[in-house]
Amino acid sequence: MSNAITMGIFWHLIGAASAACFYAPFKKVKKWSWETMWSVGGIVSWIILPWAISALLLPNFWAYYSSFSLSTLLPVFLFGAMWGIGNINYGLTMRYLGMSMGIGIAIGITLIVGTLMTPIINGNFDVLISTEGGRMTLLGVLVALIGVGIVTRAGQLKERKMGIKAEEFNLKKGLVLAVMCGIFSAGMSFAMNAAKPMHEAAAALGVDPLYVALPSYVVIMGGGAIINLGFCFIRLAKVKDLSLKADFSLAKSLIIHNVLLSTLGGLMWYLQFFFYAWGHAPIPAQYDYISWMLHMSFYVLCGGIVGLVLKEWNNAGRRPVTVLSLGCVVIIVAANIVGIGMAN
């Protein structure tokens, strides 16, 4: 395995670790509605940071974006909006299925759809099947899916042992939402694929290869921001128990506390895709679809590790922890299989 591919896998791991941890600051926010908290963090992660980073990277910010036709920008934007819909469904999936089953089904579907649909859309899936390296990477995707399933099973055992139940368990409704979440969340993978002309244009302007994907986030996350912020603002306006004015009428010190924590959560959310771009850069072009598989499987891996570090599994007993550890090992093996396949 080449050093470049190894570093690509490493940066995907760092990005996934940030994704697994980003919600921790949000949990410390006090006396704010979820909608206000999510909006403040979202403005930072989906608007301020993508625009600021792009302004630093590009020699002429406006000239870069105005150089693209609507036919180039619109698919990127719409796939970003597609991801935004999946993002909202994610929370509802947890509500009706519980954390473990919800995450397992949603992540499993988005891993498959986001990883395999890209080469199918590009018309080169047959090349993957017909080459040794391609077959190896596809095997890695299958092993990663097995690893996600094992970690999901560990979560179910933990919830059963600790008496944790879904907020409003509804299998039929939860499964529909999980499938929708999995499919729509893959929009981020499709957006990255559609944004290749933007990456190439950034490279032509002299942007470092590690950073060429970052300017496209202005458009991708702009689509996601409209969906997420629109959802939050509509609820803040329509739901009687929610009030943006009330949330910002608290003591000044508490408002500052909440804004800082929401900003930190937004920064950590953005960093997952900052490092996703770094991890994506050294991946060979014919295997760029693998980036999504690495990100999602590492997200599950890091989520399990973070849970152990935060002692969330202390009262779960030995069996759930053993199953979790097995799942984490399987995901690590999957990453190595994919790396070897890409090296071939």
UniProtKB/Swiss-Prot annotation:
Pfam family, one: RhaT
GO cellular component, one term: plasma membrane
Molecular function terms from GO: rhamnose transmembrane transporter activity; symporter activity
Positions of transmembrane segments: 4-24, 38-58, 68-88, 101-121, 137-157, 175-195, 214-234, 259-279, 290-310, 323-343
Membrane topology listed for this record: Multi-pass membrane protein
Catalysis: reaction(s): L-rhamnopyranose(in) + H(+)(in) = L-rhamnopyranose(out) + H(+)(out)
Domain of life: Bacteria
Subcellular location per the Swiss-Prot or TrEMBL entry: Cell inner membrane
Keywords, in A-Z order: Cell inner membrane, Cell membrane, Membrane, Sugar transport, Symport, Transmembrane, Transmembrane helix, Transport
InterPro entries: L-rhamnose-proton_sym_RhaT (IPR004673)
Keyword Cell division belongs to the record: no
Function: Uptake of L-rhamnose across the cytoplasmic membrane with the concomitant transport of protons into the cell (symport system).
Family: Belongs to the L-rhamnose transporter (TC 2.A.7.6) family.
Record's protein name: L-rhamnose-proton symporter
Species for this entry: Escherichia coli (strain ATCC 8739 / DSM 1576 / NBRC 3972 / NCIMB 8545 / WDCM 00012 / Crooks)
Organism classification: Bacteria, Pseudomonadati, Pseudomonadota, Gammaproteobacteria, Enterobacterales
